[in-house]
């Protein structure tokens, strides 16, 4: 019979997977619009490329030969990588110009090369426990940059006193996912998991606080902004 500790770890990691799925699904509304218009319009494909790189690096960290016992980190980021790649393919297909299409393809190649460099370096130049520390440090830096990216949007909310560009459910999903994985990391005593997700938890709470304050003032129309914020 599994111990209470094992059950708690699994429950926290599973909750993080579920809340992360809500984040991965958040751009669906944007891509429904792209499919309907058969054009990417003014939407930016860069956030999906950064998210793909982040998912690939964190997926690598969760694999047994890098960090044993982190399978739920691998599953959530494997699913995330599939979603981001699908979004990027749609973006390439519906790009308004050949220049934009080639730019996204070129950046996608760089993302793949960057991930290949990290994964190969971790295998050929590092043994345990240095391998886990190397990949963990890279994944932590990537996660922190992803969690910090909405700071610009928070600034827009404060200046405009409008939550139009900061969807509530996206902020809530970020908060809940970060809380779940912060707990998961604490239970595993894994600094590379609980520290960046702890920061994500704080930033998610700040977004929710801003939403609670400014949503009372906001009387705008539906947003045309992409739901994956950068």
From Swiss-Prot:
GO cellular component, one term: plasma membrane
InterPro entries, per database record: SWEET (IPR047664), SWEET_rpt (IPR004316)
Membrane topology annotation: Multi-pass membrane protein
Residue ranges annotated as Extracellular topological domain: 1-6, 67-72, 125-137, 189-190
Residue stretches spanning the membrane: 7-27, 46-66, 73-93, 104-124, 138-158, 168-188, 191-211
Topology, Cytoplasmic side: 28-45, 94-103, 159-167, 212-230
Gene Ontology MF annotations: identical protein binding; sugar transmembrane transporter activity
Cited Pfam families: MtN3_slv
Residue stretches making up the MtN3/slv domain: 13-98, 133-217
Entry keywords, A to Z: Cell membrane, Membrane, Repeat, Sugar transport, Transmembrane, Transmembrane helix, Transport
Subcellular location, principal: membrane
Gene3D superfamilies: 1.20.1280.290
Entry superkingdom: Eukaryota
Disulfide bond annotation, renumbered to this chain: none
Intracellular or extracellular location(s): Cell membrane
GO biological process, one term: carbohydrate transport
Biological role stated in the UniProt entry: Mediates both low-affinity uptake and efflux of sugar across the plasma membrane.
Family: Belongs to the SWEET sugar transporter family.
Oligomeric form and interacting partners: Forms homooligomers and/or heterooligomers.
Protein name: Bidirectional sugar transporter SWEET2b
């Amino acid at each position: 019979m599994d111990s209470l500790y094992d059950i708690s770890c699994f429950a926290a990691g599973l909750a993080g997977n579920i809340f992360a799925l809500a984040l991965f699904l958040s751009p669906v509304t944007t891509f429904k619009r792209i499919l309907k218009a058969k054009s990417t319009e003014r939407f930016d494909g860069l956030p999906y490329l950064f998210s793909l790189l982040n998912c690939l690096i964190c997926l690598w960290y969760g694999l047994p030969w890098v960090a044993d016992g982190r399978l739920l980190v691998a599953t959530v980021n494997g699913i995330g990588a599939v979603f981001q790649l699908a979004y990027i393919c749609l973006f390439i297909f519906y790009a308004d110009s050949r220049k934009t299409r080639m730019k996204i393809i070129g950046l996608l190649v760089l993302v793949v090369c960057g991930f290949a460099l990290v994964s190969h370096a971790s295998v050929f130049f590092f043994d345990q426990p240095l391998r886990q520390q190397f990949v963990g440090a890279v994944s932590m830096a990537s996660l922190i940059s992803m969690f910090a990216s909405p700071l610009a949007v928070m600034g827009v909310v404060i200046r405009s006193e409008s939550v139009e560009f900061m969807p509530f459910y996206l902020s809530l999903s970020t908060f809940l996912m970060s809380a779940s994985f912060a707990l998961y990391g604490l239970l595993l005593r894994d600094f590379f998991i609980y520290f960046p997700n702890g920061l994500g938890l704080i930033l998610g709470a700040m977004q929710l606080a801003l939403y609670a304050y400014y949503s009372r003032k906001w009387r705008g129309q539906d947003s045309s902004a992409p739901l994956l914020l950068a």
